[in-house]
Amino acid sequence: MMEEEECGLGKSCARSEPVAAAQPAGSPGETPAVAAESPELANYSSKCVFCRIAAHQDPGTELLHCENEDLVCFKDIKPAAPHHYLVVPKKHFENCKYLKKDQIELIENMVTVGKAILERNNFTDFENTRMGFHVSPFCSIAHLHLHVLAPADQLSFMSRLVYRVNSYWFITADYLIEKLRT
């Protein structure tokens, strides 16, 4: 079942029940028009800003080159570090809370893309990065997205709080992978 909710940036996003994120095209959570358009849009919500960006329907967002056809990457509109990128799956997943063990590869691919974007922008000190996810209900956008921040030692005081490692509201990609494996 899909409901609209305010999810940040003054936009409305679709909120789904945990199982809806993994349902196939034509599932109860999608409108018939969207599900019928194409298999690639099976988990697409026109009300979700990240779904629109991933579908190249937001001309104001510059997508960065990404070697993974299932992901898109772009700069965060409110950067917390000199390098602050978001890696977003084209498929709509509400947030990391709804991921299962069989989606570990997705998270690993998101990290790989994040590192590649940093390298392409001449940043290679991966010990000085922060890659992670906000945990519900602290997600500003109800669409899974990996924050890639570097250099981590240049985060402001507030940003160090907002992106605090393995807190109640932000977890690293490594921590998420570890939790999904257990």
From Swiss-Prot:
It catalyses: adenosine 5'-phosphoramidate + H2O = AMP + NH4(+). Its EC number is 3.9.1.-. Its main location: cytoplasm. The active site is at 145 (tele-amp-histidine intermediate). AMP binds at residues 76-77, 145-147. InterPro entries: HIT-like (IPR011146), HIT-like_sf (IPR036265). Forms dimers to octamers and even larger oligomer. Interacts with CALM1. Exhibits adenosine 5'-monophosphoramidase activity, hydrolyzing purine nucleotide phosphoramidates with a single phosphate group such as adenosine 5'monophosphoramidate (AMP-NH2) to yield AMP and NH2. Hydrolyzes lysyl-AMP (AMP-N-epsilon-(N-alpha-acetyl lysine methyl ester)) generated by lysine tRNA ligase. GO terms for molecular function: adenosine 5'-monophosphoramidase activity; nucleotide binding. This is Adenosine 5'-monophosphoramidase HINT3.
